[in-house]
From Swiss-Prot:
The chain crosses the membrane at residues 14-34, 95-115, 125-145, 162-182, 198-218, 260-280, 287-307, 311-331. Heme binds at H262, H317. Belongs to the COX15/CtaA family. Type 2 subfamily. Pathway: Porphyrin-containing compound metabolism; heme A biosynthesis; heme A from heme O: step 1/1. Keywords: Cell membrane, Heme biosynthesis, Iron, Membrane, Metal-binding, Oxidoreductase, Transmembrane, Transmembrane helix. It comes from Ehrlichia chaffeensis (strain ATCC CRL-10679 / Arkansas). Its EC number is 1.17.99.9. The lineage of its organism: Bacteria, Pseudomonadati, Pseudomonadota, Alphaproteobacteria, Rickettsiales. This is Heme A synthase. One of its GO terms (cellular component) is plasma membrane. It is a multi-pass membrane protein. One of its GO terms (molecular function) is metal ion binding.
Length: 344
């Protein structure tokens, strides 16, 4: 089969490189979450892909950067009392996030050029990696437009652009992770007693939808909602969920509705996964791993909300969502490319 043939052509070095790139993106997601939660993302008011590699050096350079920050809505409305020392802390967190993005980009680009030069990649892989390279560059542009949306008249970024930034990271991660799986799981067999690829594809869609609403929750600060809101107390009041007109705006603009949908999808994913695993009775490591990651993610989500979005828990909750998606993708590819074992 063609896939198996391509897999045999992928050398160990390429597999290691793909794995490192995936880990790098997970680290970026973690640091990105910390940057948002510490309100550091708007501290750097310019986008300099080359010069921006170097941080301010000396007192005068730091003062110049702070003067630029003083013109932003965030300073005027929220951080008007910030000291130079406090500004440095915010700046360096955002600086590290941007620097890490450059490092991850180079971690992908340089080995890609090397493996291409050494003819370690077949034509299809080269095309795929060129697309990924362009997406990484585009991610930098999307990130800047997201930051820019918080430098005009509001002291926070657009939750839509924040979501686009996160989903693009998820897409890049998926493409790299999928290629890693195709390169690693090389056995192809169709001796499958029960085909569960459709339901796990649906679970993938649900997880992506959940990540989308999780990002909207973050952008709208819905995680900081009063814990006595009706639906949290076991009651459902439509006036809280549907007070914005037209009604469909509530799905994306109403923090109460967005948080409610986020919790609803989480419950749905949990039930679908549990029921599916019980029905199919999969005796597979990735199936057990999926269940463990799902329970961990639900626990992190509940604790994050209950304790008013602490930085550590919220950051772990965000990156674990990517890991959950990766594990489900792993299981999906395992079912497609490997022989399944079932407990009768």
């Amino acid at each position: 089969m063609k896939i198996a043939s391509d897999n045999r052509e992928v050398c160990v070095g390429v597999k290691i490189w793909l794995c490192i790139c995936c880990i790098g993106i997970l680290l970026m997601v973690l640091v990105g979450g910390i940057t948002r939660l510490t309100h550091s993302g708007l501290s750097i008011t310019e986008w300099n892909p080359v010069i921006g590699v170097f941080p301010p050096i000396g007192e005068r350079a730091w003062i110049r950067e702070k003067i630029k920050y003083m013109a932003t809505p965030e300073f005027k409305y929220l951080n008007f009392n910030i000291t130079l020392r406090g500004f440095r802390k915010l700046y360096l967190i955002e600086y590290f996030h941007r620097l890490l993005g450059r490092i991850v980009g180079l971690t992908f680009l340089i080995p890609f050029l090397y493996f291409t030069y050494k003819k370690k990649l077949h034509r299809n892989l080269i095309i795929n990696f060129i697309v990924i390279c362009l997406l990484i560059l585009f991610q930098g542009v999307v990130g800047w437009f997201m930051v820019k949306s918080g430098l005009i008249d509001r002291p926070h970024v657009s939750h839509y652009k924040l979501t686009a930034h996160l989903l693009l990271a998820l897409l890049i991660f998926y493409l790299l992770w999928r290629q890693f799986l195709l390169s690693t799981i090389s056995k192809v067999t169709y001796n499958i007693k029960v085909n569960g690829t459709l339901i796990f594809s649906v679970i993938s869609v649900l997880i992506v939808t959940q990540i989308t609403f999780g990002s909207l929750v973050a952008g709208l600060n819905a995680g900081l909602l009063d814990k006595t809101i009706p639906f949290l107390a076991g009651k459902l009041m439509l006036e809280d969920l549907l007070f914005i007109k037209p009604l469909w705006y509530n799905i994306f603009e109403n923090p109460v509705t967005v948080q409610f949908i986020h919790e609803l999808i989480a419950t749905l994913i949990f039930l679908v996964v549990i029921i599916t695993l019980l029905i199919l009775r999969l005796n597979l490591f990735p199936a057990y791993l999926l269940l463990i990651c799902l329970c961990l993610q639900l626990t992190l989500g509940v604790l994050t909300f209950i304790y008013n979005v602490p930085i550590v828990l919220a950051s772990l909750h965000q990156v674990t969502a990517f890991i959950l998606f990766a594990v489900n993708t792993y299981l999906l590819h395992y079912m497609k490319l490997s022989k399944l074992q079932y407990v009768k």
